[in-house]
From Swiss-Prot:
Organism encoding this protein: Xanthomonas campestris pv. campestris (strain B100)
Subunit structure: Part of the 30S ribosomal subunit. Contacts proteins S5 and S12.
Gene: rpsH
BP GO terms, sorted: translation
Gene Ontology annotations for the cellular component aspect, listed alphabetically: ribonucleoprotein complex; ribosome
Role of this protein: One of the primary rRNA binding proteins, it binds directly to 16S rRNA central domain where it helps coordinate assembly of the platform of the 30S subunit.
NCBIfam families, sorted: PRK00136.1
Top-level taxon of the source organism: Bacteria
Protein name, per record: Small ribosomal subunit protein uS8
Length: 132
């Protein structure tokens, strides 16, 4: 099965699983999905992530969602740059999500990082998504 936008697929799977109260999300793995999930883990939005090998030399990403008092920690998860319209921002134009309460995940020349880390590193890049 061909997937047009694997990042959007990752975000929708996380959002849907959180909406129905599932503990884990399993999906096909890729380097960019693992990097985005690692940023979410580092920022405290998910509990854990695991990459496991499956048959036919494929790998599967399992994300353990985080809940606080029965509600998902991730309230908003929105794709910003999309396959039909890429959104690039310079280091001075990086967005602040909810006045700094959320994060924007940025793909830079130095890897995938949050908007705050990109500002600190002095790099801009493609704004992948917003998380709050």
């Amino acid at each position: 099965m061909s997937m047009t936008d694997p990042i959007a697929d990752l975000l929708v799977r996380i959002k849907n699983a959180a909406a129905v109260g599932k503990q884990t999300v399993k999906l096909p793995s890729s380097k960019i999905k693992v990097a985005i999930a690692q940023v979410l883990k580092d920022e405290g939005y998910i509990t854990d992530l695991r990459v496991t090998a499956t048959e036919n030399n494929k790998s599967e990403l399992e994300i353990v969602l985080k809940y606080f008092e029965g509600r998902p920690v991730i309230e908003t998860l929105k794709r910003f740059s999309r396959s039909g319209l890429r959104q690039y921002r310079g280091k001075t134009e990086l967005p602040k999500v909810l006045g700094g309460l959320g994060i924007a995940i940025i793909s830079t020349s130095k890897g995938i990082m949050t908007d705050a880390q990109a500002r600190e590193a002095g790099v801009g890049g493609e704004v992948l998504c917003f998380v709050a």
